[in-house]
Amino acid sequence: RYAVQVAELVEYLVKEKGMTCIKQFNLGNEVNLVANDPRNGYSWEKWKKSILNLRSELDKRGLNDIEIVGPDGGYWGTDVWFNKTLTELDSVVPVIDYHWYINKDWTFTNRVEDETRMFRFFTQMQDSSKVNIWGEMGIRDGHNEVLDQHTLIHQWWYGTFVADALIQTLRSGWSAAAAWGMDD
């Protein structure tokens, strides 16, 4: 039912309203982190089914050119969603999207570039046509977990370090990153 509603909305925006800017669609935010809490009943299998359903509904409406982005997960550390998206949804998800909040010191040591290069390498091993993006990227220093705010974004260095992290990310072969928290 949810996939039908989403596909109807995308169809309305593209066909009725003439929006040509919709090229990709992300179904959910940090779903892997939600699934890590067993109390909510969410899982990889449920998300996978929703992605397959969405692809089917978009295709039924002639929206085959709208790419699905995923898994839109939190940092991949021990997370299996990255691998499962590459292997189980290979033909359905052409854009691999994750979120990452780094410590500013990681830019000094090129840790950002090293880790994103590794992430890109594993993506390329599976499918060289896939694209990697950071759907959210920012600096963790000063993050208030309770209020979910970046308390240091007004410091002169915040934007500088985000820009440095973005440059390292692009050097490693990634296609894009969205700076998150620059306007908190």
List each model region and its residues.
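Active-site cleft segment of glycoside hydrolase catalytic domains centered on the general acid/base Glu
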Residues: 1-93, 98-118, 144-162
